[in-house]
UniProtKB/Swiss-Prot annotation:
Keywords: Chaperone, Cytoplasm, Ribosome biogenesis, rRNA processing. An accessory protein needed during the final step in the assembly of 30S ribosomal subunit, possibly for assembly of the head region. Essential for efficient processing of 16S rRNA. May be needed both before and after RbfA during the maturation of 16S rRNA. It has affinity for free ribosomal 30S subunits but not for 70S ribosomes. Residues 100-195 form the PRC barrel domain. One of its GO terms (cellular component) is cytoplasm. This is Ribosome maturation factor RimM. It is found in: Cytoplasm. The PRC barrel domain binds ribosomal protein uS19. The gene is rimM. Its main location: cytoplasm. The lineage of its organism: Bacteria, Bacillati, Actinomycetota, Actinomycetes, Bifidobacteriales. It comes from Bifidobacterium longum (strain NCC 2705). Belongs to the RimM family.
Length: 202
């Protein structure tokens, strides 16, 4: 047990999913871009409040999924009991977070969303799309909720009234969100046509 869990600065790195096999292994959904480092043998992971420690006994990948073996979790029943548990890793300082390409959701909220240079839509680099107002969990990956700079009329409803979109959800993956600059308070987007109302729609 850590001496003072309340003083830990923790970063969410994974959520435990289903049990894998019969020997206590679990699948995990990643929230980190550096799982090789986070899941090294003997690495310590924590519950959200820092009160519970999970020691990594081993890790591997299978069909693009990460699978963990945690100390003391030695059979399928024990593994299944952890389904849904979120794992947090200790952060030394903000510089380490930036070097590891890891962020707290609160760090992303408020960032200006701009189109990346050479974006697939052929629109000007740096064009402001909106501002990040939330980070939403989904079964596949986290989503950035972006409040659009200008609301967009996307059609009409059955009553003939305009349907106005004020926000967009963008999967938080490197292919769509290639750059994040916390110092300058912006991130860049490379969305496909139709993902963001008003950007690349015909």
């Amino acid at each position: 047990m850590h001496d003072d869990p309340q003083q830990l600065e923790l970063l969410r790195v994974a959520r435990i999913g289903r049990a894998q096999g019969l020997k206590g292994e679990v699948t995990v959904r990643l929230y980190t871009d550096d799982p090789e480092w986070r899941f090294e043998p003997d690495s310590v992971l924590y519950s959200q409040d820092g009160e519970t420690e999970y020691i990594v006994e081993g890790s591997r990948t299978f069909k693009d999924r990460w699978i963990l073996k945690l100390e003391g979790v030695d059979d399928r029943n024990a593994a299944e009991a952890l389904n849904g548990v979120e794992l947090y890793g200790e952060v030394d300082d903000a510089e380490d977070m930036l070097e590891a390409d890891e962020w707290y959701p609160k760090d992303l909220i408020g960032l200006e969303a701009r189109l990346v240079e050479g974006n697939g839509l052929g629109l000007p680099a740096g064009q402001v799309v909106g501002k990040v107002v939330d980070v939403v969990d989904s079964p596949a990956q986290s989503l950035l909720k972006i409040r659009l700079t200008e609301p967009v009329v996307t059609g009409q409803n059955s009553k003939g009234e305009d349907v106005v979109e004020k926000t967009a959800l963008v999967p938080f993956v490197e292919a769509l969100v290639p750059d994040i600059d916390l110092e300058e308070q912006y991130l860049t987007l490379d969305p496909p046509g139709g993902l963001i109302p008003g950007c690349g729609m015909i």
